[in-house]
Amino acid sequence: QEFIITARDLKQQKVFRESTIRSLFDEILRGLRIVHQHKMLHLDIKPANIFITDDNRSVLIDFGAAREVLSKEGNFIRPMYTPGFAAPEMYRRDAAMGPWTDIYAIGACIYACMQGYPPNEAPQRLEKDRIAIALSRLRGIYSDNLIEVVEWCMALDPLSRPQSVFALQKELSRESERRYTKLTMGEKVRLQFDTMVADTKKSVKGMPGLGTRQR
């Protein structure tokens, strides 16, 4: 999974400060709110589709999967989706999609900015959800408010998520929260180490003859 693109073509640190996350996604949500006001859904929000300009403004790109909201007749073509950032309802033919579907992806993007890697795919979460446990390890690094916002956005039940971009914007812009959390070197090393271990486990599991005990 490619990470957030920058106009300078520089590799950004995988882990973002809370103040940076709030600032970036405030701008992204402004653009997404306009999309939703035109009765459209993006449906492919992911870090690779977030472009950061030279003056550090964030822009949502690639509307190739964008579709109109369900009509009264229910005619709707299911778009392609990106595992980890696609909401559970995108995997089901009979599920209604709406602003809450894009909001799930926003939460997944914020999660990726905090952890340095994407969350588990929705079907995996439906079997065994580890999101809350993973986020709990970030308490003290990020504010409780930001962690709760991500959990809210990534609720498996669409009705348990913010139902509009405005509701999410309001919560994400709360001035009373600790917005300038800085990661210490030790915290950065720990997060990067955790990522390396997770990637190694995935690589070993995928190698023939490894990851399972031979008899």
Predicted segment positions?
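Protein kinase catalytic-loop region centered on the HRD/HxD motif
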Residues: 28-40
